[in-house]
Amino acid sequence: MTVMVTPAVALTGITASSTIGIFDSLPEYIEIGQQPERNTLYAQYSGEGNENGYIAVATIYDQNRQEVPYDQISQFALDAAVAGEDERFFTHGGVDVQSVIRTALDNVVAGGIEGGSSTLSMQLVKQIFVQRALELPTEEERKAAYEEATAPEFDRKLKEMKLAIGLEKKYTKKEILTAYLNIAFFGDNTYGIQAAAQRYFSVDAKDLTLAQAASLIAIVQFPNSRDLSTPDNYADNEARRDVILESMLRLGMVTQDEYQEAYDTLVDDNFVKPSATTNGCIGANRYAKWFCDYVVKNVKNFEFLGATETERQENWDRGGYQLYTTLDMDVQIPAQDQLWAYVNYNETAMNLGGASVSMEVGTGRVLTMSENKVYDNTLEGGGPGTSAVNYNADLEYGASTGFPGGSTYKLFTLLAWLDAGKGLAERISGDARTVDQARFLDTCTDGGGPFGGPYPFKNDGGQTPGAIDVSTATAGSVNGAFI
């Protein structure tokens, strides 16, 4: 293993003994593992576009990635990766000695590392270390680990060589190529060939054309200047894409006609077919944003994610979950539309808010969750008519510190009245009066009161109706009667 790279090392000025020391200090191989992916929330729906009675309503992720198996990747993309990044991928054992020696000579002339010679296996090793760095808990740790994983030093290259050789012993070529295409960064917070195909061309990875596949592989070396998120990058992307196409033709991966058709395809707005990024509840289906927010704030309670709240949050952040929720869009859509119709979110005459939740009797399953405000949790906010405060939930799950219950409590007073055997036709005083609040005990807190002193309760309209029957008092929401 060491002998394979010793000639190249000698050309760089590093001794063979130091090479052996670096090699011996490393494990035999590195685990590929599973990379962070998107979480997807689904709601019940019987309308057009549903799959088995459900429809996706939100995607939530730290990294926009969806891992796919080898057979779900276009052959054009597989071939483009090999042609563009590692022509001898299927014949070397992790390190392309021919490229290493050529690059080493270039480095000697340049007086430092100028790049090159990294096989797909070596690039995969590097990306695994980069990914691990990005998942560290603090910014300081992430920065230090990222710099170590990307440092332009010979030691790093040697580590990548050693681990790439071990990688080739543990995994098949198909597994390594698939892992590379799933971990690669394609710019614009897009990771992996599937997310890249969807982001830039609105297709799945298995359906990529030759021109599309080559354009995506053209991104990986310099994502910032070649990704397809902006027309400013189109020219650089096309130039690199054409180099990859020429390599594919030379290697016999495509026919002359296939090559010419792809080569003649301009990288422009007609070629790029981007799909909108919809990360988080702000990008969720407009009828599911508040429920999405409620679900995300409940992650710490999902026992299937782990034994502790910390473990649950970490697993959720790594993603890859398909969460089928209780939200029923067949009921949610009309519920939300009705709330918007009768409690306008743009109302400026008063601080008007409205919320509505429907639960299934017997199970407590939340079927609808609506609010008149438009959900917006961005730092700058969405202006009047928007909010990030979920009126349907408790403080712990997205609400504010609360609002006065007001006349909603009259319902419970009425129920207690009826439960005591009294009738709706009985007459009581509806006049305003001063009441000693110490008479009322708080049975929901330790100690139970008493709280407060005399308070002058008034009727909203200032009326003094005298004796009034309970039915009329309820219809008129007369405060004096309920006190």
Predicted segments — roles?
Residues M1-W340, N344-Y345:
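Juxtamembrane regions of bacterial inner-membrane/periplasmic proteins
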Residues T40, E48-Q66, A195-R199, V220, ...:
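Short pre-catalytic segments that frame enzyme active sites
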Residues M161, N479-I483:
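A small/polar active-site loop signature that marks catalytic segments
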Residues L216, T413-W417, F482:
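Buried hydrophobic packing segments
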